[in-house]
Amino acid sequence: MKQYLHLLEHIKTSGTFKKDRTNIGTISLFGLQARYNLKEGFPLLTTKKMAWKAICHELLWFLKGDTNIKYLVDNNVNIWNEWPYEIFKKSNDYQGESLKEFSQKIKEDSSFAQKYGELGPVYGKQWRDFFGVDQISQVINDIKNNPTSRRLIVSAWNVAQIDKMALPPCHAFFQFYVNDNNELSLHLYQRSGDMFLGVPFNIASYSLLLSMVAQVTNLKVGEFIHTIGDAHIYSNHIDQVNTQLERAPYKLPKLILNKNIKNIFDFTFEDIELENYISHETIKAKVAV
């Protein structure tokens, strides 16, 4: 994961300060790219402990086409809670509940979750129902039947529905590529990258998706290529980034998928294993909402 650490260092030394939507401020560079060869190990960051369970459940949630946080909260994954909570706080039903109390109510009260756990037509909706098109099923079918196609694309950026989303897609567009060695690669374009909190999560998530699609299309894994538009470090993450840059990376872990799974929608959390993951301690930071 030296590629990722090099990006952090590059932004620190060459980036410029920008004001942003969250009013926190960032150090930012535009148009960065890194490549991760999955044959060399699974690219899960080792210079801080990563929330592997959350990464897996979020991807499975996307693949279900789900856009309500209840599935995530029921599995103790709370990475999306802040956005619907901010919407709830503006409602007439808000009685001063904390984020923790809001999350507990999502878990315990299905009616409340249905009303206030919804994020709008975010990733899962666009992946599985982009104006009636199941993009995941379509791209897998195309990889199987027309692997040389230059149209192996999935887009979460639906301009007509952006205003209905709790958060417009940051990782907006990805394309698959099959080479002459029957290796499947994935290239993600991410319009906005929170380099400390979000990007390591995205690297692992799309590398997992690549691995799952490779299995169900009978291909080998190739590269994950990650292009980031506005690559930024939030001003309140600088100390955490410095701590991380002082740490030496460990050897990458190995991803093991249940080989009996032939349909991508049949994967469960129990079908995904990580072997020999060794990392440094967790580094906590606040998410910008």
From Swiss-Prot:
Keyword terms: Cytoplasm, Methyltransferase, Nucleotide biosynthesis, Transferase
Stored Gene3D superfamilies: Thymidylate synthase/dCMP hydroxymethylase domain
Tell me the compartments it is located in.
Cytoplasm
A single GO molecular function term of this UniProt record: thymidylate synthase activity
Reported EC number(s) for this entry are 2.1.1.45
Gene Ontology biological process terms in this record:
dTMP biosynthetic process; dTTP biosynthetic process; methylation
Q: Main role?
A: Catalyzes the reductive methylation of 2'-deoxyuridine-5'-monophosphate (dUMP) to 2'-deoxythymidine-5'-monophosphate (dTMP) while utilizing 5,10-methylenetetrahydrofolate (mTHF) as the methyl donor and reductant in the reaction, yielding dihydrofolate (DHF) as a by-product. This enzymatic reaction provides an intracellular de novo source of dTMP, an essential precursor for DNA biosynthesis.
Please report the name of this protein according to its UniProt entry: Thymidylate synthase
Q: Which species does the entry assign this protein to?
A: Mycoplasmopsis synoviae (strain 53)
